């Protein structure tokens, strides 16, 4: 559902149409609330990128907040009991890290994109990344593509860099 959510978000920002975004996000939250937490975090980050690159009025921020809350409200029949149940467990009181700590180096993280890397099943915080080496070969092509506006290239590459950084630091994890 993530591609539909992002398509809906782009329609919301560019055309003011909210239906696909709201319904797809609600279905995502309802069907798998745990992964939807990550999807919602990415949606907020991508929304910021769209605000930077699309030259829209900040009135769209109100629509984004409204339809995001509406999507969460549509899934609240599942969310409210789940939140109550989680608050009764040890996960209800998370300890937020007080010091910045890196789990592994950037080169080690980038090596996870190569073939024949074992799947991480432990608690060593290694991300399972499977996009392949082609992404790194095509990254300079994207960065140097003059057909894409510089602001859009910079914002998208900054988002990708932030996501890679978030895999390896405890505060962003």
What do the PLM-derived regions correspond to, one by one?
Residues 18-23, 36-40, 61-69, 152-160:
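Hydrophobic alpha-helical transmembrane segments
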Residues 1-6, 13, 30-39, 125-134:
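Membrane-interface micro-motifs in multi-pass membrane enzymes
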Residues 8, 19-33, 70-73:
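Membrane-interface alpha helices of multi-pass inner-membrane proteins
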Residues 2-4, 20-28, 134-141:
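Hydrophobic, membrane-inserted alpha-helices
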Residues 60-144, 150, 162-173:
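Periplasmic/ER-lumenal interhelical loops and adjacent helix-loop junctions
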Residues 5-20, 53:
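Membrane-interface transmembrane helices that cradle and orient dolichyl/undecaprenyl
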Residues 21-22, 35-50, 82, 134-137:
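Transmembrane-embedded, aromatic-rich helix segments that form part
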């Amino acid at each position: 559902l993530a591609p539909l959510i992002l398509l809906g978000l782009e329609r919301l920002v560019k055309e003011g149409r909210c239906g696909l975004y709201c319904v797809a996000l609600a279905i995502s939250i309802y069907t798998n609330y745990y992964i939807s937490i990550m999807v919602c975090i990415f949606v907020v980050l991508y929304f910021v990128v769209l605000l930077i690159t699309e030259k829209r009025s900040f009135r769209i921020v109100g629509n984004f907040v409204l339809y995001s809350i509406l999507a969460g409200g549509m899934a609240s029949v599942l969310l409210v009991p789940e939140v109550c149940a989680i608050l009764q467990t040890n996960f209800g009181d998370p300890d937020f890290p007080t010091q910045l700590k890196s789990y592994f180096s950037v080169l080690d993280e980038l090596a996870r994109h190569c073939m024949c890397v074992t799947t991480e099943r432990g608690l060593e915080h290694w991300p399972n990344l499977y996009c392949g080496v082609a992404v790194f070969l095509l990254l300079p092509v994207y960065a140097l593509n003059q057909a894409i506006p510089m602001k859009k290239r910079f914002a998208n590459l900054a988002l990708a860099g932030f996501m890679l950084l978030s895999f390896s630091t405890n505060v962003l994890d």
